[in-house]
């Protein structure tokens, strides 16, 4: 006989896709008991007679999933680069665009000239698209300021945005995103600034949860990333890394060496990289939006990740240059159609494994007692439909921290 249990709200009348251990874990005709912001019981509604609820909601069918988690975005930036997209489709090369001082430097200029209020307002509009699809947790990176004052302003904008939206926002300092134009002849000096000036100030003001870098031949070398990681780890930051997107430099193994939460992109990760990630619990964050827009050919080694049991997350990588994507569900479909993931892996990739990539798997990402009450009610019969449909089928309800938003 179950012990009597009291809760604030009992949600029932739908199939619960728990995603415990990264599997669907479906409870048919299930129920979720919530007290305050937390789940205190999940199970079949037929077994809930012992629960005394102050409020009950019959969902009337459909499925319930954990709130979706977008674990890699660049939502805060100034300006717009749709003109470059059009130029490329009219035959203008990347090098020609760069010669016109376009590309990432165009975003850097626009971001540096934008006020904090302008950055927040623009990012909020982008973020609303993700939230409308059932996203309840979002990571947002800096990295378009590339000078101390502008990087701090970006992180302050992220913090301000977090206070204005019904979602959990995780901030990541990505000052090692590209070499600033002022340091193009001396990138080591910019690494000095990051390590000696910027990161200590970010830590002192509590502006970031993690530190990221871009390890690639057109950005920062493994040795330069190592310097950033040593400084960041000494200050208590969690670590993440853009690695193996365009070439194999051993960045994924470097991330694992430092016990980084994730290595992201990872198209060129080797078996030794994957083995290192498995040993250190580093999540592989796959970013099909950038792969698609750049028309890349090298797919991430999904079979190796499976074989070595490396958790695979999916994210939008929402950014103005290589992934202007504001739909996490589209990324789920791309993860399946472009990378060969299964629908179950894709859903795990935007719930439990995405939570792991943010160091939050003990609090969010699956529906079980003790976790935060973040969940989404969908007008669907099967979880695979979330991946199958391209657009449409918005949530019936989104519950964030126990409250319908």
From Swiss-Prot:
GO molecular-function terms, A-Z: imidazolonepropionase activity; iron ion binding; zinc ion binding
Pathway(s): Amino-acid degradation; L-histidine degradation into L-glutamate; N-formimidoyl-L-glutamate from L-histidine: step 3/3
Residue positions binding Fe(3+): 72, 74, 242, 317
Location (main, coarse): cytoplasm
Catalysis: reaction(s): 4-imidazolone-5-propanoate + H2O = N-formimidoyl-L-glutamate
Protein keywords: Cytoplasm, Histidine metabolism, Hydrolase, Iron, Metal-binding, Zinc
Lineage top rank: taxon: Bacteria
Compartment(s): Cytoplasm
Biological-process GO terms, alphabetical: L-histidine catabolic process to glutamate and formamide; L-histidine catabolic process to glutamate and formate
UniProt: Zn(2+) binding residues: 72, 74, 242, 317
Cofactor(s) the record lists: Zn(2+); Fe(3+)
Binding site for N-formimidoyl-L-glutamate: 144, 319, 321
Sites where the protein binds 4-imidazolone-5-propanoate: 81, 144, 177, 245, 322
Enzyme Commission numbers on file: 3.5.2.7
Cited Pfam families: Amidohydro_1
Cofactor note text: Binds 1 zinc or iron ion per subunit.
GO cellular component, one term: cytoplasm
Membership in a protein family: Belongs to the metallo-dependent hydrolases superfamily. HutI family.
Record function comment: Catalyzes the hydrolytic cleavage of the carbon-nitrogen bond in imidazolone-5-propanoate to yield N-formimidoyl-L-glutamate. It is the third step in the universal histidine degradation pathway.
PANTHER family, sorted: IMIDAZOLONEPROPIONASE, IMIDAZOLONEPROPIONASE-RELATED
Name of protein: Imidazolonepropionase
């Amino acid at each position: 006989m179950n012990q009597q249990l009291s809760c604030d709200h009992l949600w029932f009348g739908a199939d619960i896709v728990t995603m415990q251990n990264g599997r669907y874990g479906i409870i048919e005709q299930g129920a979720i008991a919530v007290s305050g912001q937390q789940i205190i019981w999940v199970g079949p509604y037929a077994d809930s007679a012992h629960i005394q609820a102050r409020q009950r909601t019959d969902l009337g069918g459909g499925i319930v999933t954990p709130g979706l988690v977008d674990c890699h975005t660049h939502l805060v930036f100034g300006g717009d680069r749709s003109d470059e997209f059009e130029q490329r489709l009219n035959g203008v090369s990347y090098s020609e665009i760069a010669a016109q001082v376009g590309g990432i430097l165009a975003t850097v200029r626009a971001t540096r000239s934008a006020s904090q209020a302008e950055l927040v307002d623009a990012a909020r509009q982008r973020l609303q698209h993700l939230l409308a699809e059932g996203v309840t947790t979002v990571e947002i990176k800096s990295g378009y300021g590339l000078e101390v004052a502008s990087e701090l302003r970006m992180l302050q904008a992220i913090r301000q945005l977090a206070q204005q939206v019904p979602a959990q926002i995780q901030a990541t300092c990505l000052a090692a995103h590209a070499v600033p134009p002022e340091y193009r002849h001396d990138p080591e000096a910019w690494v000095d600034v990051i390590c000696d000036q910027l990161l200590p100030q970010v830590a002192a003001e509590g502006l970031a949860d993690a530190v990221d870098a871009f390890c690639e031949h057109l950005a920062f070398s493994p040795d330069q990333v190592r310097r950033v990681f040593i400084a960041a780890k000494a200050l208590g930051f969690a670590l993440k890394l853009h690695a193996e997107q365009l070439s194999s430099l051993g960045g994924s193994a470097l991330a694992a060496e430092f016990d980084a939460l994730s290595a992201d992109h990872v198209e060129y990760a080797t078996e030794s990289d994957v083995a290192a990630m498995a040993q250190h619990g580093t999540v592989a964050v796959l970013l099909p939006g950038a792969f698609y827009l750049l028309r890349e050919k090298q797919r991430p080694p999904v079979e190796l990740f499976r074989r070595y049991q490396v958790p695979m997350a999916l994210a939008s990588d929402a950014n103005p240059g290589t992934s202007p994507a504001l739909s996490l569900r589209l990324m789920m479909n791309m993860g399946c159609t472009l990378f060969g993931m299964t629908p179950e892996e894709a859903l795990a990739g935007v719930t439990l494994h995405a939570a792991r990539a943010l160091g939050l798997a003990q609090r969010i990402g699956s529906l079980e007692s003790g976790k935060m009450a973040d969940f989404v009610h969908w007008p669907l019969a099967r979880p695979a439909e979330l991946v199958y449909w391209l657009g449409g089928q918005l949530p019936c309800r989104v519950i964030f921290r126990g409250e319908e938003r």
